Amino acid sequence: CNWCAKPIYGNRYNAHSPAYIVKEIAYIKKHFGVTRFWMCDDIFGLKPNWVQEFKTLLKKENLPIRYFIQSRVDLLIKEDTIACLAESGLEEVWVGAESGSQKILDAMDKGITVNQIYQTTHLLKQKSVKVAFFLQFGYLNETREDIQKTIKMVKELKPDNIGISI
């Protein structure tokens, strides 16, 4: 997006391997008894097959956990990603829905569609994963009609949690 972390941190994306993360989780769980985690990665699952390998390693190491992530709707609807996330203990995902207006999403350079927001939300809920939306109101050139589209989307999709920026 043209206003998010990418312009701040640049185009470089650094991520630990699933094996490294599973090792860290095992350590934290063993030494501190933690069973719920917030994964601090605003595009969790960006690298192909990362989520699938993460799920496999958690099961192999017998590490049942519950966790929360932030991700993008276009990443989540790829292949078997949602199924793997649900099977590995995902409790809630925060997505940058931002707006129910395609015009506003395009102005933000989100690279997603309103339809993808709907699809992803339905798929996550089918797997009993809570869905939370980050929304923005007052984006440059946003009209009342754009705001009404966002309100309509929220009423139809009924996210479990909402964070609003104005």
Outline where the language-model segments fall.
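Radical SAM [4Fe-4S] cluster-binding motif and immediate context
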Residues: 1-134, 139, 152
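C-terminal accessory regions of radical SAM enzymes
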Residues: 130, 145-166
